[in-house]
Amino acid sequence: CIENQPALKNPTMKSIQMIIYSYFLIRGITSEDSSIEDILMINARNKLKAYDGEKIECDIKDKYKRTKYLGIKYCEKMIHDEDELFIEKFKESKKKDDLADAYLQGVYSSNIHVQKKNK
């Protein structure tokens, strides 16, 4: 899955998104020896849906900052009982928001994939 980028807010990132999409379309889906079946464009707000734990209080007004904060907190909760190496890397990272984004997006897209297979 690839995080969908807003075209008007950041056209450079939208271009990079489409380059990545094209690469995986050409090298992945059309290649006979590839295991890639589909390429999903995921809206950035959907990654927070991967978390189904207890509510985390947050009174941050700015939507962007609130989403970053909640993404980090959700990721911390979700990995708490998981891989110790990943937990340490996450705690030490200066880019927790990016790691949390990638993790939550992966969980969300995996959930979608499982739901599609179960239909």
Q: Locations of the language-model features?
A:
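Phosphate- and other anionic-substrate recognition elements at nucleic-acid/protein interfaces
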Residues: 1-119
